[in-house]
Structures are given as structure tokens and as C-alpha cells.
Amino acid sequence: MGPKLLESRLCLLLLLRLVLMLASCLGQTPSRWFAIQHINNNTNLRCNVEMLRINRFRRTCKGLNTFLHTSFANAVGVCGNPSGLCSDNISRNCHNSSSRVHITVCNITSRRRIPYTQCRYQPRRSVEYYTVACNPRTSLDSPMYPVVPVHLDGTF
């Protein structure tokens, strides 16, 4: 049982590296991609408009996306909170926010196998705490923040 657990952890780490490399190829650091996908101070955002911005990078319809109505600096501040286990039950670089923020969850309503420019979304708005995974900044990130959010692990 031990070797299989080790193999699955190695596979997960390789997959994470691949995702980070893909983000770099798109000209985005993981923290910049996090900000593009999840940070938006406009509490009245229109899902169809904002998701088109994200889908242009992906060239496909993303099924679900959560926007945090806070600043990137506030999300970085969450990285200073105590760390804990992430939802993958392996990584331990997740941090819970200490206050709730307004969020908008955009859920796809159109068929996913259509041109990404035609995706349609339904918003769901609420006020929740959130969890982010944080990593040391890359050389391409601002030196202002030594540790940055790279993944929205969930809301609660």
C-alpha cells in the first residue's frame, strides 16, 4: 500500500508541475493566472463577460468559476494565515481567510461543446470565507509579495 500512495503523490506533483508550466507558456505566472480567474472587485460582474475573458485563454468553456470580490493584496494576506491540508488531502499549503467576502460563482448553462465565445453562465452571489493555496513567488512575480496565492481551493 505504501508504494501506491507514493506513486499517486508523485503523479499529483507531476500534474501540478505540468499545470504550472502551462500557465507559464501562456505568459502568466501561477499567481497572475489566479488573479485573472478569481479576483474581481466588481460585485455586479456579468458572468458572460468575465468568463469570456478566461475562456479566451483556455479556448474552451470553463464549467464553473468563482470570483472573489476582494483585492489581490487581500488574497495575498490570507497566505499569512496558518496553513493546513488542501482539498486534495496531500498538499499542506492552504490557508483560510479570516473574514468573509462577497463572491460570485459563474456556472455554465450552455452546452460545453460549443465555441468558447458562445458560452453562457448563470451567476450565484453570496458572502463566504475562502481557502487559497499559496506558494513562494516566481522570479516573474512582483518582489512585493514573497508568498502568493496560486489556487482557489474552495469557499465555505
From Swiss-Prot:
Q: Where does substrate bind?
A: K62, G63, L64, N65, T66
Q: Which Gene3D superfamilies match?
A: Ribonuclease A-like domain (3.10.130.10)
One MF term in the entry's GO annotations: nucleic acid binding
The positions making up the signal sequence are 1-25
For this chain, the annotated S-S bridges are C47-C106, C61-C119, C79-C134, C86-C94
Catalytic residue list = H38 (proton acceptor), H151 (proton donor)
Check the record and name the CDD domains matching this protein.
Answer: RNase_A_canonical
Question: Which keywords accompany this UniProt record?
Answer: Disulfide bond, Endonuclease, Glycoprotein, Hydrolase, Nuclease, Signal
Q: Does the keyword Repressor apply?
A: no
Glycoprotein listed as a keyword: yes
The glycosylation sites annotated in the UniProt record are: N41, N89, N96, N107
Family to which this protein belongs: Belongs to the pancreatic ribonuclease family.
Q: What is this protein called?
A: Eosinophil cationic-type ribonuclease 3
